[in-house]
Amino acid sequence: VTVLSSALDPAAPDHRAHREAMLAKLADLDAEHAKALAGGGEKYVARHRKRGKLLARERIELLLDPDTPFLELSPLAAWGSEYTVGASLVTGIGVVEGIECLITANDPTVRGGASNPWSLKKALRANDIALANRLPCISLVESGGADLPSQKEIFIPGGAIFRDLTRLSAAGIPTVAVVFGNSTAGGAYIPGMSDHVIMVKERAKVFLGGPPLVKMATGEESDDESLGGAEMHARTSGLADHFAVDEPDALRQARRVVARLNHRKAYADPPLAEPPKYDPEELLGIVPGDLRTPFDPREVIARIVDASDFDEFKPLYGTSLTTGWASLHGYPVGILANARGVLFSEESQKAAQFIQLANQRDIPLLFLHNTTGYMVGKEYEQGGIIKHGAMMINAVSNSRVPHLSVLMGASYGAGHYGMCGRAYDPRFLFAWPSAKSAVMGPQQLAGVLSIVARQSAAAKGQPYDDEGDAALRAMVEQQIESESLPMFLSGRLYDDGVIDPRDTRTVLGLCLSAVHTARYEGARGGFGVFRM
């Protein structure tokens, strides 16, 4: 056992200052999460309850096994846009009859649960997670279809929702739809393309065209119930497999459907693991407010891995990147964590070798980000930083074991790519409130623009406006700073959620458990050409 020793002093002024700054960021985050929980606001929640209906999260709660966790995904979707935070959809992973399932629930208190561009992105991300991890998919449906004013952004890409449902089914991943209210127009294909369909009596309405559209198109008079009611679909069309008397009955029946799926995880759950030897509360004070100040990622690793036990790989070589083996909730993991921000040639080669080893052993990889990117300068360009950085990115791109990423601090430039950023398909990616991600730091980006403008003016023989330059730099810095914050990026679905650092071990444990529903095998060779 190689237990990490900790040099962290929780009473030190620096630690206390970092902790206070993190708590302030968490308070801001809670306020944004509260907006998602509030849905369409008091008026629409009251109207929904008056109709005798449960809210989206109440439906999920009744569906899940008692006292089991629900890992909500993309809760801040649409943050900073014209749409409601959460994007009128709740998605996440929960346990139903002992089986981990991917659950999506429309929030009908937000514009009737209608889909907007961010709900679409959020639903597609949920489908990707279900497919990659072979999680049964349960849709709790109550939606008026597409939000018509934004149809130009939804209609064409929105077809992927139905494509995904058929692909899940074709891959042997069960899909279940429980219809609580309207599921009209395009929304009618959700139950139409699910393996199992449950509808609530006198509430579920599933049709391609409602009475007004039918009247306009054919001249036929009809009503909701005869056109698409639950009883009609249960008795006549055969679209409903199960007929429920009310919402709790529908959710009870959904649980019975899942119990009968004969769906098994590819791997047995590991035995109960020993918790870390250090207090997770101390994670709040590790990341400095100024991300240019380095911190030791071993202090983080010591507070998230089983028994704080970590076997480091190449500890004396490429020391800006910490690599090594550990277990997390009993699951073996290989960890890559940035130690001093910048990645040099040595770190890149070390990472490529470590990723290959993890693939040889079929061990998932955890990337802990705090990087400003790859080193620049004459010495490093001549030393081959491009080909060595490319080697690391090649290894990450072609690795076949599951990857998990957590942005703790900076995640800038190609360093974000090398550390398995969103474009590299990690199974899950979460951010701490202290994280920042952009093409480069705000000061660097503003400075580069300033230098280019100054050189351009000199080449034309024009005087340079220093006052205007200072104003431009300030404006660019402010813009890049605001666009690199975790809530902004989470709103755009560039992560799966912004989490409290103290929850990191729990969140990663839930992710690793979900990952082990599907069988995986590392790449044996099969990496692109490494430039040596």
Where are these regions (language model features)?
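Ligand-binding clefts of soluble mixed alpha/beta catalytic domains
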Residues: 1-532
